[in-house]
Structure formats: structure tokens, C-alpha cells
């Protein structure tokens, strides 16, 4: 811990030396780039290491300025290394993200000789992005779409690694820096930590700027959306090209309209300042964690690109299997607009499509179509059918999943116990473990490790990493199931109210 503190001080001093500062006073001399507005702090329940306000901050106030020469980009790395520059120029077929990944590994291979060493030593050793999930953690997601996204992310990473292999060999990287595990690390670093820059789609690594933890878009930027209101959709970008903007796409009454976007006060690269400028996105009190918004993401997208998820995420969406004939009726809305909000309310597009789908084809005249596209109820009986169908569909999806909400809650509780080295498990507790917990212990050969000697439990690092990813899988699927359960409750309540009007 003391060594970590010392290396952090070294990094902050190095950052100050190259012009990074949390003060607008350019003449201010300091042995740290922080201290005027921000300081490094630990937030165990809110993202871990982050930045806290050391004074009151006002919305829109500049809180960190990182000059262009301090940004870690492909441009800045090849400019100071002829060997790297010559090798990169011979591989124009590689994507900008692949090139940046190779450059990052090349700098890592230099060790203390790298100009970026004070920054590189503070990068995480491990990440929890979906591409890093093993077979056990992947299957623990349970939901077919989530498993597919994970497999796709892993396959993409493997393909990009193989394509970049020749360049890494030409740079004479040591075998450990050419390995797939090293590539996974570099790819995850770039996916989760880069910020948008206008001259390179791969983005940049921003020393000190990547200490901020994530904040979801505020309520002031979200539209309240239920079956009778406008629909909000979002199209997440890969993390490496996210530019700290949150975009809200609004479709009025099911019609495709021009995208409405609002730039947040978080910041971006400013040409006139020749620096990355980051701003307070709201007012902060002394001691509060200062956060940045990367964009609008579902929890699965956050896991894919960043390696974490949010318990409360107003941008989360749950997709359920729908009949092919239903999709054919939804031509006025994108398929990704047919979803359930995290609070359990079906989206405008999903409800509107169901209203039309549940009307006999012979009765789908112009008057019905006008009501559908206006977002209006066709009839009380039709609305009851819609709510009944949604409730039964969600119930069917829940029943077909391997575990229930209560079982997942218990499993999360047991995982937390395993992760706490101070908690000694009693024999009767381990005997009550469910099949998934037992499978995890079997795979990792941990039955002896969690013995009953009364000593603190210490798992191997690899096991702890696997457990963290497994916990995220269970946490994600639990959120998915809760949304379905909330949708059942919402639909049943609405159905009962509608039935009351018929009496």
C-alpha cells in the first residue's frame, strides 16, 4: 500500500511536469497535477479508485486540463521511436485500434525506459470486459443474447490479435507481450480507458483524465418513456471512440425523426487550447466523487466495453424473444426499439407493435393504423390483450432460465462471502451451496481451500479474477430477471385497472 502511494505521487508529479493540471492558473507551480480541484481517493462502493472534489465545484467548471503532448496516442508514440514508426507504416491494413494496441504493448515492453512509465504502472493489471470472460463466466450469463455478445467479443479480439501478430514480431516484442493474454489486456485498456480525439478514431489514453469513474446520463437528459409517451433509444459507440457525449434519440409517435443530441459539459479535445479539457458535469460538494459520463449504455454494453455495470441504469434495456410475424409489423421502428425498460415498462415501440399485432388482420384499417402510430390505445379489450401477452411472455422467459431471482440473490450473497477473506464459512453453509457454486468450487479445486480451520481464506489471483467476472454475470442476469418480474407486475396492475373499467 505504501509503495502504491509512492508510485502515485511519482505519477502525479510527472503529470504536473508535462503540463497536466486541475487549475486554470498556468503559472501555478506544483509537485502534483492535482490539489486545486481534485484529489485521488478510494470509493469502495462506487467504482474503487477515483477523483474527489477538494473544494466546491460548479457545473461547467474546468476541473482538468491535459495538453496534447501529454496524451498517449499512436501519433505521440511513433513520433519518438523510429523503429516503431517504420514498422507501423508497413501495416496499413490494421485498424487504428489495433495499431494503438500494438504501440501500447511496445511501450510496456520498454519498462522503465518508456517515457510513459509513470503512467503505465498505474494501469489496471486485469479487466472484466466480456472478451475476458472464460467459459464458466460466459455460461453464467444464462441469457442467449448475452452469451452471443460475449462469444462475439472474444472472437473479435482473437481475430485482431492474429492479424497484428506479424507487426508484433517485427518489433521483436518478447513472447509475453505477443501472447493473447497480453493482447486481451491491451485491447481492454483501449476499450475502457480511451477518450475521443478528432485526428485518430482509436482515441487516446489520457493520463489523470482516466482516473474519473463513470456516471450515467442524468435525468435531465432522459425522456420519461412509457407506452403512451415518446421512445428514447441510444446507439452505443465502441468505447474507444466515445467522446464523452450522451446522445438521446427521440422518436415521436413511432415516426423516425431527426436525432436530437445534447453535448454534456464533461468535455473533449479543444483545438484552441490544444488540450483535452474536462469539466464538472454538475455541482459538487467538498469530498464528493467527481464523475464523467461516457455516453448512454445498457448494462450489457457497459460490461462489453468497460467491464462493469450499474444497479440503477436508466439506459438499460431488456430484450425478449418475439414472434417473427411481430417483427414484420414493426417495420416503422428499429428492432432494437422493441424492449423493456429497467423499471419494467415496455417501450413505446413494443407496446404499439403489440397493439397492432393483436388486432385481427381483417380489422387493421386506416383508423386502427392512425391510433397505433399516434401511440394511442385502440380499445380497452385490445390493451388488456397486450398487457396479458406481455405478462405471460415475461413469465415464460423467466421460467425457462436455469435459476430464479431468489436463487440468484442467494448465490450473490454466497459469492460475496467467498470474496471476503475475513469470513469463515461453516460446514453447514458449504453443504447448502447450490449446483452453480459447487461447480465453481470444483472447477477451481477449492473445496480444500475453504476448509474449516478458522484461518482467513486466500484464493489464488486467477481464482479471484474469475470470481469477480462470475459475480458480474450473476449480477447482470439478476438485473435482467428483476426487469422481467417488474414488467409482469406492471402489466398485471394495468390489466386489473383496465378490467375494472369494463365492470
Regions found by a protein language model. Name each.
Residues 218, 222-225, 291, 303-305, ...:
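Short conserved micro-motifs at the rims of enzyme active sites and ligand-binding pockets
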Residues 64, 291-292:
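Hydrophobic beta-strand signal
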Residues 226-231, 296-297, 307-312:
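Active/binding-pocket-proximal capping segment
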Residues 57, 88-94, 124-144, 212, ...:
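Eukaryote-specific, cytoplasm-facing alpha-helical/coiled-coil scaffolding segments in long proteins
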Residues 2-83, 174-199, 203-281, 286:
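Conserved AWS/pre-SET-to-SET junction and N-terminal core of the SET lysine methyltransferase domain
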Residues 111-185, 189-196, 208:
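C-terminal globular interaction/adhesion domains in large, modular proteins
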Amino acid at each position: 500500500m505504501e509503495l502504491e502511494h509512492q508510485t502515485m505521487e511519482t505519477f502525479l508529479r510527472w503529470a504536473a511536469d508535462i503540463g497536466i493540471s486541475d487549475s486554470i492558473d498556468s503559472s501555478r507551480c506544483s509537485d502534483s497535477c492535482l490539489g486545486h480541484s481534485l484529489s485521488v481517493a478510494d470509493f469502495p462502493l462506487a467504482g474503487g479508485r477515483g477523483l474527489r472534489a477538494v473544494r466546491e465545484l460548479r457545473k461547467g467548471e474546468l476541473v482538468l486540463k491535459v495538453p496534447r503532448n501529454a496524451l498517449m496516442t499512436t501519433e505521440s508514440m511513433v513520433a519518438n521511436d523510429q523503429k516503431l514508426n517504420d514498422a507501423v507504416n508497413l501495416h496499413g491494413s490494421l485498424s487504428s485500434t489495433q495499431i494503438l494496441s500494438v504501440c501500447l504493448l511496445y511501450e510496456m515492453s520498454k519498462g522503465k525506459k518508456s517515457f510513459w512509465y509513470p503512467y503505465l504502472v498505474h494501469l489496471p493489471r486485469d479487466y472484466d470486459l466480456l472478451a475476458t470472460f472464460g467459459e464458466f463466466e460466459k455460461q453464467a450469463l444464462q441469457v442467449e443474447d448475452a452469451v452471443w455478445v460475449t462469444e462475439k467479443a472474444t472472437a473479435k479480439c482473437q481475430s485482431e490479435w492474429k492479424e497484428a501478430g506479424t507487426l508484433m514480431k517485427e518489433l521483436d516484442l518478447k513472447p509475453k507481450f505477443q501472447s493473447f493474454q497480453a493482447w486481451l489486456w491491451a485491447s481492454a485498456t483501449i476499450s475502457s480507458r480511451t477518450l475521443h480525439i478528432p485526428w485518430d478514431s482509436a482515441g487516446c489514453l489520457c493520463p489523470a483524465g482516466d482516473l474519473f469513474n463513470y456516471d450515467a446520463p442524468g435525468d435531465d437528459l432522459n425522456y420519461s418513456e412509457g407506452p403512451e409517451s415518446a421512445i428514447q433509444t441510444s446507439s452505443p459507440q465502441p468505447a474507444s471512440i466515445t467522446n464523452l457525449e450522451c446522445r438521446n434519440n427521440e422518436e415521436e409517435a413511432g415516426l423516425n425523426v431527426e436525432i436530437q443530441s445534447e453535448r454534456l459539459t464533461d468535455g473533449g479535445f479543444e483545438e484552441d487550447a490544444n488540450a483535452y479539457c474536462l469539466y464538472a458535469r454538475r455541482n459538487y460538494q467538498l469530498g464528493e466523487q467527481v464523475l464523467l459520463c461516457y455516453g448512454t449504455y445498457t448494462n450489457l454494453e457497459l460490461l462489453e466495453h468497460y467491464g462493469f455495470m450499474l444497479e440503477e441504469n436508466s439506459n438499460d434495456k431488456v430484450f425478449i424473444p418475439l414472434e417473427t410475424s411481430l417483427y414484420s409489423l414493426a417495420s416503422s421502428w428499429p428492432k432494437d426499439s422493441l424492449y423493456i425498460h429497467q423499471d419494467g415498462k415496455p417501450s413505446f415501440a413494443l407496446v404499439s407493435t403489440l397493439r397492432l399485432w393483436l388486432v385481427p388482420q381483417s380489422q387493421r384499417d386506416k383508423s386502427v393504423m392512425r391510433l397505433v402510430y399516434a401511440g394511442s390505445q385502440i380499445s380497452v379489450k385490445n390493451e388488456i390483450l397486450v398487457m396479458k401477452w406481455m405478462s405471460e411472455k415475461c413469465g415464460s422467459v423467466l421460467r425457462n432460465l436455469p435459476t430464479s431471482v431468489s436463487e440468484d440473490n442467494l448465490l450473490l450473497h454466497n459469492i460475496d462471502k467467498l470474496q471476503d477473506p475475513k469470513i469463515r464459512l461453516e460446514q453447514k453453509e458449504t453443504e447448502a451451496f447450490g449446483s452453480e457454486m459447487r461447480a465453481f468450487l470444483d472447477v477451481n479445486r477449492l473445496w480444500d481451500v475453504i476448509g474449516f480451520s478458522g484461518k482467513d481464506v486466500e484464493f489464488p489471483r486467477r481464482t479471484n479474477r474469475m470470481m469477480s467476472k462470475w459475480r458480474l454475470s450473476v449480477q447482470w442476469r439478476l438485473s435482467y430477471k428483476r426487469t422481467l418480474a417488474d414488467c409482469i407486475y406492471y402489466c398485471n396492475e394495468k390489466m386489473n385497472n383496465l378490467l375494472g373499467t369494463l365492470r
